[in-house]
């Protein structure tokens, strides 16, 4: 026993600090989420700047890149169509089977005048009541890592994500797509073409003071998360036209910022940044329940 106790003692570390427990601050989602309507405006203003401020060669390069990107997108959607249709078919079959399991048929005790003529050889002469217990509605909230470490696999990841959004659209399943990034969105800084210049960095520091993302309830225990942004690239709240345009923008952007490459110019704020994964998880604690409430969903 003494030898065991000594061995345990030798395993102790004098450098270990005390365990500290922390709490989470309240999130100001209005300063974190960039809604799909705002993202659309970012792309629109970028296109306006390209048309008015870029050289003819740059404009031609951009136009060609957009055409090639859109063609590639259509080729991908055509290729994925059979997969999406199969997913929808399986989903609907499962729904039908689930509805059948939830169906309960009972006799009412009220005579069925149509079946009464069969009373001599059948006792089944009463009206039946068919009832269905409520099923469960589904919804999907997707969070995409929009960081530099994703550059090698971003295109493949986006392809998988779009298969899910296409499925949701065909199966009428509500969905939201958020990309989490350390790159912040400041409307007044869209004019900058170089986000690494000193003027841009100074402007960001000045704006950081006003764009609070967290409300600290307990200064002694609340952690201090990094500031980040959630870009709502795609949503079931979009109209068919809005979704089509957003899909083209999203596809072109993912190709341009990844190692896959692309000739589509994109806004600075939508470039790949760091990985605020923990912050995105904390934000999901508020986003998912609100998504459930707004859409009347049980399963997310």
Predicted regions and their residues:
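Acidic, glycine-rich A-domain
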Residues: 3-300
């Amino acid at each position: 026993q003494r030898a065991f106790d000594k061995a345990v003692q030798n395993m102790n570390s004098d450098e270990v600090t005390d365990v500290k427990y922390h709490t989470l601050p309240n999130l100001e989602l209005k300063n974190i989420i960039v809604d799909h309507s705002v993202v659309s405006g970012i792309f629109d203003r970028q296109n306006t700047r390209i048309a008015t401020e870029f050289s003819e060669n740059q404009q031609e390069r951009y136009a060609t890149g957009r055409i090639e990107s859109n063609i590639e997108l259509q080729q991908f959607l055509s290729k994925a169509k059979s997969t999406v249709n199969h997913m929808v078919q399986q989903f609907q079959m499962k729904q039908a089977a689930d509805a059948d399991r939830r169906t309960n048929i009972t006799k009412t005790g009220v005579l069925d005048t149509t079946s009464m003529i069969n009373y001599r050889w059948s006792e089944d002469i009463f009206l039946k009541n068919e009832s269905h217990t409520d099923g469960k509605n589904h919804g999907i909230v997707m969070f995409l890592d929009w960081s530099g470490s994703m550059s090698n696999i971003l295109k493949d990841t986006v392809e998988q994500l779009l298969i899910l959004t296409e499925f949701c659209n065909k199966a009428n399943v509500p969905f939201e797509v958020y990309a989490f990034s350390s790159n912040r969105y400041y409307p007044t800084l869209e004019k900058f073409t170089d986000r690494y210049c000193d003027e841009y960095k100074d402007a960001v520091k000045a704006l950081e003071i006003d764009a609070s993302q967290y409300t600290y309830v307990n200064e002694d225990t609340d952690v201090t998360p990094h500031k980040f942004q959630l870009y709502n690239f795609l949503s079931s709240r979009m109209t068919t036209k809005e979704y089509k345009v957003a899909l083209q923008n999203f596809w072109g952007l993912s190709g341009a910022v990844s190692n896959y490459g692309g000739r589509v110019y994109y806004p600075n704020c939508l470039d790949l940044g760091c990985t605020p994964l923990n912050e995105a998880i904390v934000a999901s604690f508020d986003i998912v329940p609100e998504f459930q409430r707004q859409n009347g969903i049980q399963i997310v």
